[in-house]
Amino acid sequence: MDQPRVILIDVISSQTKPEEAKRRLLELESLTHTYGGMIVVKIIQKRVTPDYKTYIGPGKLEEVIAIAEQEQVEIIIINNLLKPHQIFNIERMVERKGIKVWDRIDLILKIFQKHADTTEAKLQIRLAGIRHMGPRIYRMGLELSQQAGGIGTRGSGETNIEQMKRHLAVEERAIKKQISKYANTRSLHRARRDKMGFKTVSIVGYTNAGKSSLLNALTKKGAYVADELFATLDTRVAKLWLPSNDPLVKGGHPAKGGIGGLSVLLSDTIGFIQDLPPQLIQAFRSTLEETVHADLILHVIDVSDQYMDEKINEVEEVLAELEVTDTKKIYVFNKIDNLKRVPRTAIKKKYKAFKPVFVSCKKSEGLEELKKQIADSL
């Protein structure tokens, strides 16, 4: 399949630090590569405030359109959340040239669509899409109304708006009803596990930190792993046996893994990202319930990432939004094989409260120490 040619635009304030601007653009590049696009031009624009009509301003927009025509660009991606009228106004200027215009959420939704395997994931993406695209569709209906209605008349476009709203409202209710069935099934499974005495451990982390790799390394589950963002959208659950010398965990309890051991359930789900839009968090809330109700959280961190600390904070912000603040956490610093020297002492000091463990899922290093920490925490 041919790669679509893409222009990337990021609009930042004049107060944005160069390092932060660089990071924002790097992440947008990673998202675009994950989607499968070929980046031909990257543009950073500094503005005090976004342009009301087109976000990037008329002069810059004309410049971008000229470049897009010259470079035979198929998609313009703006690394911000645009208002419906802003993206609508840009689309009107480029639609005859065959160029698509996406904002940051459009791009993430396209990646989600590419990676969705289960019916539930597809439903969640559709729900997020309706919530994101709905206002834009209303804007299109309003434009039809203004064109068809004339002065002092009630045009067919106005009826179109109402029809669109009703259609999307009915579809949203139907999707939420189907998603709730999956959520109820998961709730019943959790209740059964609680009754049997199973402990649950949830793996969270920034996307591409190595969550699925950790699940595979600990349980041999065989979850899909790829060096790209959002490779995993669905919740995967696997059993992990923890050897223990503690006499309290010996015996014939159904949740025990035999003499001197404990079986726990390990779950892995969608990765987080900088400025993860609220509607996406809400759409995936049912699959994130495993994290909300876990007895222990393993926060997987790419220790070789130059933006490691910022990404730790962003994952914690999402957990706070999910109201996961009191659950015990272990920080699992992954990919130690990517560094010649890992600053263990400094990391242990900074994140002492989260019992840091250093591992390489790729080389199966540090996993026994992690198992011990999990057993001790539980």
Q: How should each PLM-predicted stretch be described?
A:
Residues M1-I108:
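N-terminal accessory targeting/assembly segments
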